[in-house]
Amino acid sequence: MTIKVAIAGASGYAGGEILRLLLGHPAYASGELEIGALTAASTAGSTLGELMPHIPQLADRVIQDTTAETLAGHDVVFLGLPHGFSAEIALQLGPDVTVIDCAADFRLQNAADWEKFYGSEHQGTWPYGIPEMPGHREALRGAKRVAVPGCFPTGATLALIPAVQAGLIEPDVSVVSITGVSGGGKKASVALLGSETMGSLKAYNTSGKHRHTPEIAQNLGEVSDKPVKVSFTPVLAPLPRGILTTATAPLKEGVTAEQARAVYEEFYAQETFVHVLPEGAQPQTQAVLGSNMCHVQVEIDEEAGKVLVTSAIDNLTKGTAGAAVQCMNLSVGFDEAAGLPQVGVAP
């Protein structure tokens, strides 16, 4: 049986990264996976070669308009659409179609949080696409609807969830994530112009205003016996892609560096895409570039009485498209790691 895949929002950064990964997927090489409709609103009528010269295999494919009719007849549909648009399309697709949404529309469980941060009516919650979270891999196997996590919540959750679950820390965390400009998407923006970003760092959506704040709190709260307070600060850096996250929290009394390291090594021992670095090594965005990996380091600041966890991911791969393909693999029964690079690009 051949699985036919469509990508809505194919000309965006996330859509292009999904295409790159699918073209390297063993199921594509064997004919078990076929790439069908490629759609987008603003670039409909253009060829993929005009928009994405790094994907010559599909250069002649014409981008179609994003409609439910165009996406009909596919087994899997990836949605790389702006927040709010995904729900509109998803609700028109049949229950037998596997829909994997890279937007935020179905991530949050709390309707009030959705309405506060996104300003529209909450459309519900789908199985959440971080397989490394306790219980999530099982929920994703065979799932027909999947909410791909946000890029910042991915880095923050993988950094902190072992410590929260093991009760190493107080439920009050501070997260700072430095991100590349591709996280802002392809839409023209003065704030993302090279002349505005090169040689400069800038915090934005501070003091709890960023939309990913409730998502991080939701994830950590799943493994905590009480709500987790999250202070989240994103920082824009002059990088095309990558997220470096540093997370701190007060330690519970008596927790040692050895205990913390043992918790992380055990938690991620069987995880293909999370690597706990040796003592003294630090995560680097370059080391995970183009891969589906998350590199993690855990340390104890004894003077401050805090844990310090650092993580690095590629925001377009493990932070979006890689997670989407990982979830597709689980949903349709492929090997979970199929088509997903475990080695970064260096230098």
From Swiss-Prot:
Listed Pfam families: Semialdhyde_dh, Semialdhyde_dhC_1
MF term (GO), any: NAD binding
NCBIfam families to which the protein is assigned, alphabetical: argC
Organism of provenance: Corynebacterium glutamicum (strain R)
Residues annotated as catalytic: C151
Keyword field: Amino-acid biosynthesis, Arginine biosynthesis, Cytoplasm, NADP, Oxidoreductase
Keyword Transcription found: no
GO term, biological process aspect, one: L-arginine biosynthetic process
Signal peptide: none
Keyword Amino-acid biosynthesis among record annotations: yes
Enzyme kind, highest EC tier: oxidoreductase
Catalytic activity line of the entry: N-acetyl-L-glutamate 5-semialdehyde + phosphate + NADP(+) = N-acetyl-L-glutamyl 5-phosphate + NADPH + H(+)
Cross-referenced Gene3D superfamilies: Dihydrodipicolinate Reductase, domain 2 (3.30.360.10), NAD(P)-binding Rossmann-like Domain (3.40.50.720)
Cellular component terms per the entry's GO annotation: cytoplasm
Location in the cell: Cytoplasm
EC number of this enzyme: 1.2.1.38
Name this polypeptide is given: N-acetyl-gamma-glutamyl-phosphate reductase
Sequence similarity: Belongs to the NAGSA dehydrogenase family. Type 1 subfamily.
